[in-house]
């Protein structure tokens, strides 16, 4: 049976009364966002809107993006990525649990020196997935060219974010490539392994 989203008490600034809000709304007020599921268009739209709002409120304060995601849609993930680069606020990324595929790409896209992971996190990189089903050959060819273009773009971005040579990224992402938090730091996907909030 699903647990549901927990509610917590929250007092609006200037109000003497508390009200109950879902925990994500409460944490959002502290500039803490979560990517805790598959990356979809809906998830991307929500995160993009929240980042734009928080940046417009105060671009001098960082936005904290906690990631525990198996990845998902490349186009939805790139919308989040572009917004992370677009906002003036630093975006601190923190892996809790698993950052795989597009989740790992977004983890690595955080502000330099502010890409973090908890000690028992796992990070997995690989090439973008694409599939076809009963489509015309010309459509399959168009889709294959687009997947290869996206693969090249993601690998080049990953090489830039990690400092690894493009050829190494291309080889490592050819299949699922799992790393521990420490290995991800050595690889350049993150900057620091943390075990306490004060380290973030």
UniProtKB/Swiss-Prot annotation:
It holds the Pfam family CLP_protease. Gene3D superfamilies: 2-enoyl-CoA Hydratase, Chain A, domain 1. It is found in: Cytoplasm. The keyword Hydrolase applies. The active site is at 101 (nucleophile), 126. Belongs to the peptidase S14 family. This is ATP-dependent Clp protease proteolytic subunit 2. It comes from Prochlorococcus marinus (strain SARG / CCMP1375 / SS120).
